[in-house]
From Swiss-Prot:
Location, primary (coarse class): membrane
Gene this chain is encoded by: rnf152-a
Function: E3 ubiquitin-protein ligase that acts as a negative regulator of mTORC1 signaling by mediating ubiquitination of RagA/RRAGA and RHEB. Catalyzes 'Lys-63'-linked polyubiquitination of RagA/RRAGA in response to amino acid starvation, thereby regulating mTORC1 signaling. Also mediates monoubiquitination of RHEB, promoting its association with the TSC-TBC complex and subsequent inhibition. Also mediates 'Lys-48'-linked polyubiquitination of target proteins and their subsequent targeting to the proteasome for degradation.
Reaction catalysis annotation: S-ubiquitinyl-[E2 ubiquitin-conjugating enzyme]-L-cysteine + [acceptor protein]-L-lysine = [E2 ubiquitin-conjugating enzyme]-L-cysteine + N(6)-ubiquitinyl-[acceptor protein]-L-lysine
Cited PROSITE patterns: ZF_RING_2 (PS50089)
Organism whose genome encodes this protein: Xenopus laevis
Record-level Gene Ontology MF annotations: ubiquitin protein ligase activity; ubiquitin-protein transferase activity; zinc ion binding
InterPro entries, sorted: RNF152_C (IPR045744), Znf_RING (IPR001841), Znf_RING/FYVE/PHD (IPR013083)
Compartments reported by the entry: Lysosome membrane
Metabolic or biological pathway, per its Swiss-Prot or TrEMBL entry: Protein modification; protein ubiquitination
Name of the molecule in the record: E3 ubiquitin-protein ligase rnf152-A
């Protein structure tokens, strides 16, 4: 088989979608790999599974489904499909002296798979390479691998956010009180001005 790039190894060569728990990499008898969704569509249209490239037939016994075909071990080794729900958080690990973890948004269409390498923009348009790592919920460290000073800094930052919210609310209330006070002074002065021009009768 010809040498494939890392990206083409991670995607089905029929639909060009990345392999995922829903689109598992299935191995045909001719040793080519397609995603389970494409193979299910092919199976619905024809009795036997024919490889789109070499036309080799992969026979499935009666009552067997595409999901019972073996996964391609080479592809599975690269993508390491996790047994987790789509709500499992995904983190990136920055290669540096310390270990920093940042939550990433996960979309269904273009979700990053474990082992994907990307980059994160830093101030000054510098790029830092990152590697994506997924962790099942029960294995996620609370603060085990993160240095204590970073944990404290994060707690302080969250405390600042809470205190800045309260200080904003207090500021609004204080400004409202000052405006009511000033309005009272203005109204009082206006009532005094109108009394100045009235005739005072002497008794």
């Amino acid at each position: 088989m010809e040498t494939l790039s890392q990206d083409s190894l991670l995607e089905c060569q029929i639909c060009f979608n990345y392999y995922s728990p829903r689109r598992r990499p299935k191995l045909l008898d001719c040793k080519r790999t397609c995603c389970s969704v494409c193979l299910q569509q092919m199976r619905a249209c024809q009795k036997d599974l024919r490889c789109p490239w070499c036309r080799g037939v992969t026979k499935l016994p009666p009552g067997y489904s595409v999901s019972q075909l073996p996964d391609d071990p080479d592809v599975v080794a690269v993508i390491t499909i996790p047994h987790a729900s789509e709500n499992t958080p995904v983190f990136i690990k920055l290669p540096s002296n310390g270990c920093y973890m940042w939550p990433l948004p996960v979309s269904k269409e273009r979700a990053l798979l474990p082992g994907d390498i990307g980059c994160r923009l830093l101030p000054g348009n510098q790029q830092k390479p990152v590697t994506v790592v997924t962790m099942p919920m029960e294995q996620q460290p609370l603060h085990g691998n993160i240095p204590q000073d970073i944990v404290e800094e994060e707690h302080e930052r969250r405390g600042v956010v809470k205190s800045s919210t309260w200080s904003g609310i207090c500021t609004v209330i204080l400004v409202a009180c000052v405006l009511v006070f000033l309005l009272g002074i203005v109204l009082h002065n206006m009532s005094c001005i109108s009394k100045r021009f009235t005739v005072i009768s002497c008794g």
